[in-house]
């Protein structure tokens, strides 16, 4: 749809909200910190003090999810402050850093110099300061002599981090000790650790009862518990012991009663939550064993990961008793490969034992490679066992045919072309068509495959042999098996820049012609590839750029539309003020932004061409995106239809999935950070909040309305926070307003609504698939959030909301976008002269250069 065909729905709530700004990750030393130093007194906490502090913390928004031990630990970090009547504690409009609990006296609250209420013992104030260094909304003075307990934000959040890390590491060590989890991967064990729920039991309280059907595994973290069978005491369990592991695998009665001997704390994992996070545990365990065994096979390690997973899914799993002939040389017909999942089996050839296979071991490479060969071996169980059988039909279903060589050949071609930008984002259908179009040709030693100066029309991959690259009669380099050359000939009519000569007899190459390629790749995708390659080929110097317009403005500077005079290619130049970076302590973040942006290579993510710097600015030269912000587009479109929401959310999902695969969490997903290109497709921009994440992060960063609960709570988070933002965006697309805190500007109230508010939908939203997906994306527990299980983004893509959506056509730019701008649209459009004075003022500011940007 073109933008001149759209009549905005002016009364629609989505037109009403202002653009939202992100919170930056930094800590300032505030005036409040200095003030508190003058009122600090050392004092031990009495029992009644601990009671008062704990009661107040339990009512605190950020502390609402903490357990008793965590509350007690935080209480220990509270400091004692003394104030005289009339003393100011906090001042309206200034940045806050402390949270206070009144120990004695009265404290008066003023808003705009008007007294609005008086607080007394047990009351608390400054809660927002525990989350972020936001401005105080009121002034508070001591109405009488009084005392306060207080804690500084950095201390509070550092304590939360320490407690969370300690708890996670302890739970993870317990998980490692449970034998049923032995065959799980590190990622799977971490997911189970995150799913642990702490349960506390009083002395004499029954944890599990003999004969009851259970679905929970318990691991003792603290305390002791007694085991009884038929009312007879059997033994005492202590810290690190676990029980109920079979409840995760089987629906059977408990074999014993276990009663807490003293105050006891357990980490518990229930089967239902485990199924959400990981899937059926037994299936996952067997699948892991099969996948690992297949990866050890000389044959199967050459097929794709997807094909490996398909084989593991389609393998036939069977149970066998002890001393049973599982496979007999005279009776085997279709089985080609076996994997031992449980137990031991013995392998025979010509009635002679040739080895014993245990769990995780496999056999059958020779029969997979030559499927017409008659099975000569016999397999006999030595004990009760479970075996995975891969048959001819399994191989045919997963590999497309029974020819394993053809499948390996196909995968080699695919792995090669997927490394090249020109082919990387072809749809599966396009990729298959391209690979099927490859033909084989042979050359002898000295033959020219490509002649320098000739206009080419073929792309080559070396199947076997070697070639040398020669330019101006000078040998440049040698290429061998699986190397490629000539790919530019598929897009451009230009002379070959070098000759390629065979250095061996019987050189074998795969090739595809330009005419075939253009039948497969056409329209928007071809135009996109041409522009992308042209942009990347161009070498740009700062002195060659001519500023035409100012097209954007942000916290740290401006974005210019610039022209590269030698080539007439236009770019966007983001100019970042070093002064602003230093003032806001963003030195590390700007370096990280450069690193992440430079590595990104995805059609739905802004492409960085190169960076520059001088004494006052950093410069990011990127592709120019001319279609305006998604923020404005959804206001032109009004309420999005299902197909429109699918297009935009699907595009965002593909971009974020690319980042998560590289362990990058974006942390500021919102329509303001998404541009539309001239074809109407999305471009994710602004990586100022992004981070390479290993383990968990604790920084409060992002735009409040789009923040996931785990970011606010400060107990650690991972890439799951971006998936929460999917839910916020989808809600905004189809409902109009934001799901939480839509009418709020006060950050504490926004956070309160995110953590405790009810998710409701307007009456005009009736699409149940949309509603259900939003509910699952906006699940406050990350481990229960769709897209956060071991299946990852697959669960979202296969959700019923996307049932009629073609992901292949989206990636291949074959879908019609909801909005295509007929004219260039930018966030701002300012004449250069209007901003020259600002640049001059900045240029006259001295920067304390400590070489922190030496690698920029």
UniProtKB/Swiss-Prot annotation:
Activity: how regulated: Activated by cGMP. Not activated by cAMP. cGMP binding allosterically triggers a conformational change at the alpha C-helix of cGMP-binding domain 4, which bridges the regulatory and catalytic domains, causing the capping triad, composed of Arg-488, Gln-536 and Asp-537, to form and stabilize the active conformation. The cGMP-binding domains acts cooperatively to activate PKG.
Annotated region described as cNMP-binding domain 4, given as residue ranges: 422-521
EC number assigned by the record: 2.7.11.12
Residues of the Protein kinase domain: 545-802
Positions of 3',5'-cyclic GMP 1 binding: 117, 126-127, 129, 136-137
Reaction catalyzed: L-seryl-[protein] + ATP = O-phospho-L-seryl-[protein] + ADP + H(+); L-threonyl-[protein] + ATP = O-phospho-L-threonyl-[protein] + ADP + H(+)
Sequence segments annotated as region (cNMP-binding domain 1): 62-177
Binding annotation for 3',5'-cyclic GMP 2: 477, 486-487, 489, 496-497
Annotated stretches, region: cNMP-binding domain 2: 180-279
Gene deletion effect: Knockout sporozoites can infect their mouse host, however they fail to develop into erythrocyte stage parasite due to impaired late liver stage development. Sporozoites invasion of hepatocytes is normal due to residual expression of PKG. During the liver stage, the development of merozoites is normal but the release of merosomes, a vesicle containing the mature merozoites, is impaired.
Keyword Nucleotide-binding recorded: yes
InterPro entries listed in its UniProt record: AGC-kinase_C, cGMP_dep_kinase, cNMP-bd_CS, cNMP-bd_dom, cNMP-bd_dom_sf, Kinase-like_dom_sf, Prot_kinase_dom, Protein_kinase_ATP_BS
Main localization (coarse): cytoplasm
Positions bound to ATP: 551-559, 574
Cellular component terms per the entry's GO annotation: cAMP-dependent protein kinase complex; endoplasmic reticulum membrane
Cofactors that this protein relies on: Mg(2+)
Part of a catalytic triad required for cGMP binding and cGMP-dependent kinase activity, annotated site positions: 488, 536-537
cNMP-binding domain 3: annotated span: 299-402
Signal peptide: none
UniProt-listed CDD domains: CAP_ED, STKc_cGK
Active site: 668
Domains: entry comment: The cNMP-binding domains 1, 2 and 4 bind preferentially cGMP. The cNMP-binding domain 4 binds cGMP with the highest affinity and is highly selective for cGMP. The cNMP-binding domain 3 does not bind cGMP but is required for cGMP-dependent catalytic activity. The cNMP-binding domains 1, 2 and 4 can bind cAMP but with less affinity. The autoinhibitory segment (AIS) interacts with the active site and inhibits catalytic activity.
Family from the record: Belongs to the protein kinase superfamily. AGC Ser/Thr protein kinase family. cGMP subfamily.
Name under which the protein is recorded: cGMP-dependent protein kinase
Record gene name: PKG
């Amino acid at each position: 749809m073109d933008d001149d065909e759209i009549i905005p729905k002016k009364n629609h709530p989505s037109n009403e909200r202002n653009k939202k700004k992100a919170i930056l990750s930094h800590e300032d030393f505030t005036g409040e910190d200095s003030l508190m130093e003058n009122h600090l007194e050392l004092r031990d906490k009495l029992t009644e003090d601990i009671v008062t502090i704990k009661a107040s913390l339990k009512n605190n928004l950020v502390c609402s999810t903490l357990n008793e031990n965590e509350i007690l630990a935080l209480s220990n970090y509270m400091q004692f402050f003394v104030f005289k009547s009339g003393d100011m504690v906090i001042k309206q409009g200034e940045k806050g850093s402390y949270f206070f609990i009144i120990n004695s006296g009265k404290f008066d609250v003023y808003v705009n110099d008007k007294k609005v209420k008086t607080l007394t013992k047990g009351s608390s104030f400054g809660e927002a300061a525990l989350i972020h260094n936001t401005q105080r909304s009121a002034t508070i003075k001591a109405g009488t002599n009084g005392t306060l307990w207080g804690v500084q934000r950095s201390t509070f959040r550092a304590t939360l981090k320490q407690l969370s890390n300690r708890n996670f590491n302890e739970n993870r060590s317990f998980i490692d000790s449970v034998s049923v989890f032995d065959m799980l991967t590190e990622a799977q064990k971490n997911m189970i650790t995150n799913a642990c729920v702490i349960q506390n039991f009083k002395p004499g309280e029954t944890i599990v009862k003999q004969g009851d059907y259970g679905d929970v595994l318990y691991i003792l973290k603290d305390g002791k518990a007694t085991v009884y069978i038929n009312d007879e005491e059997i033994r005492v369990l202590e810290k690190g012991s676990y029980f109920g592991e079979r409840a995760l695998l089987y629906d059977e009665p408990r074999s014993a009663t276990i009663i807490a001997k003293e105050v006891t704390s357990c980490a518990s994992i229930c089967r239902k939550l485990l199924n959400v996070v990981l899937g059926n545990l037994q299936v996952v365990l067997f699948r892991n064993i099969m996948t690992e065994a297949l990866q050890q096979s000389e044959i199967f390690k050459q097929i794709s990961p997807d094909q490996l997973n398909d084989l593991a899914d389609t393998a036939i799993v069977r149970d066998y008793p002890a001393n049973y002939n599982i496979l007999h040389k005279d009776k085997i017909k279709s089985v080609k490969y076996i994997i031992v999942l449980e137990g031991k089996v013995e392998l025979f050839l010509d009635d002679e034992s040739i080895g014993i296979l245990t769990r995780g071991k496999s056999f059958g490479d020779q029969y997979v490679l030559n499927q017409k060969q008659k099975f000569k071996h016999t397999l006999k169980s030595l004990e009760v066992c479970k075996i995975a059988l891969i048959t001819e039909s399994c191989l045919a279903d997963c590999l497309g045919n029974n020819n394993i060589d053809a499948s390996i050949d196909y995968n080699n071609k695919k792995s090669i072309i997927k490394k090249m930008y020109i082919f990387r984002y072809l749809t599966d259908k396009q990729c298959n068509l391209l690979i099927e179009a490859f033909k084989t040709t042979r050359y002898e030693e000295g033959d020219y495959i490509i002649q320098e100066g000739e206009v080419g029309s073929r792309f080559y991959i070396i199947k076997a042999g070697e070639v040398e690259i020669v330019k101006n009669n000078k040998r440049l380099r040698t290429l061998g098996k699986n190397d490629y050359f000539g790919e530019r000939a598929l897009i451009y009519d230009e002379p070959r820049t070098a000759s390629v000569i065979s250095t061996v007899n019987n050189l074998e190459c795969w090739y595809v012609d330009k005419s075939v390629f253009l039948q497969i790749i056409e329209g928007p995708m071809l135009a996109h590839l041409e522009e992308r390659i042209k942009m990347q080929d161009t070498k740009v110097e700062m002195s060659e750029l001519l500023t035409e317009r100012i097209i954007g403005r942000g916290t740290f500077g401006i974005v210019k539309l610039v022209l590269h005079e030698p080539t007439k290619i236009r770019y966007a130049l983001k100019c970042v003020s070093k002064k602003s970076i230093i003032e806001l302590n963003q030195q590390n973040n700007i370096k990280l932004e450069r690193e992440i942006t430079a590595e990104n290579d995805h059609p739905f993510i802004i492409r960085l061409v190169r960076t520059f710097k001088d004494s006052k600015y950093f410069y990011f030269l990127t592709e120019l995106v001319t279609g305006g912000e998604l923020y404005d587009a959804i206001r032109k479109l009004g309420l999005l239809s299902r197909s429109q929401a699918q297009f935009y959310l699907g595009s965002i999902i593909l971009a974020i999935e690319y980042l998560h695969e590289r362990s990058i969490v974006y942390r500021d997903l919102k329509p303001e950070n998404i541009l539309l290109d001239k074809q109407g497709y999305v471009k994710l921009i602004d990586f100022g909040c992004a981070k390479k994440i290993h383990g968990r992060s604790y920084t409060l960063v992002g735009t409040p309305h789009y923040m996931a609960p785990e970011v606010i709570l400060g107990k650690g988070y991972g890439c799951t926070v971006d998936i929460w933002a999917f839910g916020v965006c989808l809600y905004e697309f189809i409902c109009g307003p934001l799901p939480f805190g839509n009418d709020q500007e006060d950050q504490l109230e926004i956070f309160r609504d995110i953590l405790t508010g009810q998710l409701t939908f307007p009456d005009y939203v009736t699409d149940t698939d949309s509603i259900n997906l939003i509910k699952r994306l906006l699940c406050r527990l990350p481990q229960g959030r769709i897209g956060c299980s071991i299946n990852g983004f697959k669960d979202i893509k296969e959700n019923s909301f996307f049932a009629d959506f073609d992901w292949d056509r989206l990636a291949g730019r074959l879908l019609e976008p909801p909005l295509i701008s007929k004219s260039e649209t930018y966030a701002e459009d300012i004449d250069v002269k209007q901003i020259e004075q600002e640049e001059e003022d900045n240029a006259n500011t001295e920067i304390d250069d400590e070489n922190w940007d030496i690698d920029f």
